[in-house]
Regions:
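Extended, compositionally biased flexible segments
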Residues: 1-96, 101, 108
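Catalytic-pocket segment enriched in acidic/His residues
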Residues: 2-14, 26, 30, 36-38, ...
Length: 189
């Protein structure tokens, strides 16, 4: 199955699928839930584009590899190159869209890797580990500090969050990321 960025109306977004920059423990409540310390700066890791699948297709959860943890996330699609330390206006101008995403983790494998002080990307980067819905155009979102995200499973709400609860808000977070490496059109935060 081939993934292609698209807007809610079905219009294809002609950016190549790039990297997926993820932020671990960006919500204090989630860090506490996992008995992890709340980080003092963004905890960044990257998923390869090969792990992305569209939400509208069926996707498989590799239960044979152990417990699979899921988290609803707010995905931000980058539409213009960003590097070094862009100002907030440049970052806002480079945002092409927002979408709900599902971040899947092989939790048992991640715990084993962490216990050995090994990198744990393989527990978060398997094929299908990043499920992306269609994007809402960036300029359609008026308040980046009030984007809701909810995950229900069989009618039961499992997660109900909002961007206002982020330890690192969207624009400063993207600025921080650009201080470490460039973002290109098609990259997803």
């Amino acid at each position: 199955m081939t993934y292609q960025h698209q807007y809610l109306d079905g219009t294809r977004i002609h950016f190549p699928l790039g990297k997926v920059v993820c932020v671990g423990r960006n919500y204090a409540e989630h860090a506490k839930e996992l008995n992890n310390p709340v980080p003092t700066e963004p905890l960044l890791f990257i998923k390869p584009g090969s792990c992305v699948v569209p939400l509208d297709d069926s996707f498989s959860i590799p239960a044979e590899r152990g417990a699979v943890h899921y988290e609803a996330e707010i995905a931000v699609l980058i539409g213009k190159p960003l590097s070094k330390t862009p100002d907030a206006e440049e970052v806002l101008d480079a945002i092409s869209g927002f979408a709900p995403a599902l971040d899947l983790t092989l939790r048992e494998l991640q715990d084993q890797l962490k216990a050995k002080s090994y990198p744990w990307e393989v527990a978060k980067s398997f094929d299908g580990a990043c499920v992306l819905a269609a994007f809402v155009p960036g300029d359609a979102v008026e308040d980046l500090s009030d984007i809701g995200i909810r995950l229900s499973l069989n009618g039961e709400v499992r997660q109900d969050g909002n961007s206002r609860d982020m330890l690192n808000p969207i624009l400063p977070l993207i600025q921080h990321i650009c201080g470490h490496f460039s973002l290109q059109p098609g990259d997803v935060i």
